Amino acid sequence: MSVRIDIHADDFGESVHASRDILECLKDGKLNSISVLANMSCFEECVRLYREAQEEFPWQPAISVHVNLMEGSCLSDPKDLPDLVDEKGHFQISWEKLFFVSFLPSRNRFKKQLKKEIELQIKAVAGVFSELNLQELRIDSHQHTHMIPVVAEALFEVLEEQGWKASYIRDAKEPFFVFLQKTSLYKTYRPVNFVKNILLNYCSALLQKRFRNAGIKPMYLWGLIMSGHMDEERIRQLLPNMEKKAEHNGRMLEILFHPGQVLREEISDEFSQEDAIAFHVSPDRSVEKQAVYALDLAQKVRKR
């Protein structure tokens, strides 16, 4: 196989413990790239931990800005984001509301607020990671909100207005039928994740022209239908067909893991999306970390 594969971890900077987990993976050469979010209170400490550990990395990972509009504190003045945050500045908007707003007359009001925050979050990460070139930015987002039409429009306008360019923007386009080729796995999938897959594939279709015009290379993401439980056994079974699919369509393949676990005692009011807390503290994050180690794909794909 000649397809390019990226072994990626989201959520560096979500909590100190989660970030330490990710740093352990980096030091052991198990990841090719990570996403960094800048709007949690532990951000500066996590950056310090990264710098302390960096010399132990066998190679330097690619770093993406993990735009976070679902949780944490806004970097903007809360008064400038009345539709997105509460009185404490914590995000309180839902994914679903942003999606539906994309098709309503109020979209421009929301887009103006989104642009302020997206710009500040990109600047915050780029400001402490000199590895990030503002002419070759890598961008993704918490819960893939950048795929929502109004958020995507805000993001691309920020890039254009600031004179920034992106070499990578995650296209959360996950092949659907690959998961149906192994009938023995049917009962292992959560039905709600099929809904996520279909919805994000719809959003992806709306964004293909923007991606092409921005020079973003075509890709597949693997990590939606198995979201929350990217385990070794199923990945081994599905990987050959997933690689074939990516190679056939001339797309790179990003395999997305969440190997960093938030401790229950780290949960505070900045984790403002209550439904997501169980995901953050779930033991399944340890399952994903174990898979990253057992599969040991990061170094293999670097040699291709």
Positions of predicted regions on the chain:
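Terminal accessory/targeting
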Residues: 1-6, 16-134, 150-304
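DG-centered beta-turn motif at the end of beta-strands
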Residues: 9-13
